């Protein structure tokens, strides 16, 4: 059975993006970037909501091209070797985009679904392949969590209080106990928290 892994940057006060969707509060960390570039190889499918898909396509679609002038994913600046590794992987992955408003998706290996059907996600999980990963996509994260479909939560908590923004789990109405798999502090002050669903059930 394939797993669904959720990865998100998070402020210390629980926001995964600023009020206008910005991520300029993210505290970059070289060690964390190397880990992300290594771990991306364990996944072959990305699940996206519309806004995250559009943000990712705008940057990552061209980030493997050394001649590209696209800005960095969080701040303008020269891309690292790790960014290139992640870009190559993302461009080859299957990308499933959930949106009621998009008419088409043009990124390589992307397909559009207008509704998140838990039965279809279960079918995807039962198929052969590597793990599936969710970046950003607060609404999709909430829906998958509600249906008990996320197997691992990976949160990189940044040392910043934003005061306002978009909470990651604002649409989750059921309690979910988690088991801590790993807690790792990085030199930047970022802290990686990895959790699995306790017993695989929600209540």
For the regions a language model picked out, list residue spans one by one.
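Portal/gating segments that form or line small-molecule/metal binding sites
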Residues: 1-149, 159-203
